Amino acid sequence: MKMRAPAYPLITVDPYFSVWSTSNKLYESDIKTWDSRTCFLIGKAEIDGNGYIFMGSAKDMDLPPMTQTDVTVNSFSTTYIFEAAGVRLTADFFTPVLPIDLDMLSRPASYLKITADALDDTRHTVNVTVYASQDFCVERKLQNCVLTERLELSNGISAMKMGGVEQAVLGSSGDDRGIDWGYFFLACNNGTVQNKEMADRVFLQSVSPLDTADNNTATVVFAYDDIYSVKYFGEPLRAYWKRDGKTTEKIIEEAFSKYDNFKSRCDEFDINLCKSAADAGGEKYAQLLRLSVRQIMAACKLVVKNNGEILYIT
């Protein structure tokens, strides 16, 4: 059963690292944070040399959109399907915050898997670019307030990180505030990640040269290192995933190597949840519960105190 969501979840890690689409079509509006601030996340596909937009309004690019033909939401994924110029493009947003596994629940990484397939018998070139702006890591909009850095990761992963020049960790709080500390990461396993300036912002962009034959898939990972996550009665606390000294770079490498495992476990959880919910309240209730899982998981943060006590804070 199809349900029109009030906002479609894209990245749903925690309150500071979650973005949503508030329109029926992914390209009809800018991507937003939970409190409706614009967080520019743009997707462009060049099909046989002709450019199209599939994510974000991207008004400055003056490109036509692909046609969105479908969108589905489950407990961990939102999947869009687009068509243009003989190509079907599938964009699957997946955040593996599995509630029965604290290590997975705490991981600060989210995926966008792009797949290009031909709608005809022609081999098409499909160059996919994903742009992520400095809005992910700073509230200020001046270009000179952020720095970018290229990372050296294993297995041919291209990655960069971006963060504010000033790092006032836990320096602000309250509703209607974005994070103004820590580092945003963008990584890709089939392409290159670069930095780019557009208008009044700095972007990280992944560029994946695909085709509709034997090179039709690319996976992009979005990740975040918030350094410290919360101040709990005056005590700065780190995220649970950091308890043994793991780095964000390691999280990203594991995100690619363990993707299939994470996906299968989350799919199994979703199937069981959906069946139980449908048995209890019908298909409409099951779909509503799926969307609720996305909203709930994006509203919480798993941290650990210095004495080892685990806190799940919303």
Language model features by range: what are they?
Residues 1-8, 98-104, 115, 119-314:
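Acidic/polar, glycine-enriched structural segments that form the non-catalytic walls/loops
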Residues 26, 112-113:
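A short, Gly/Thr-enriched small/hydrophobic beta-strand-prone motif that recurs across taxa
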Residues 51, 86-90, 123-125:
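Short, mixed charged/polar active-site loops
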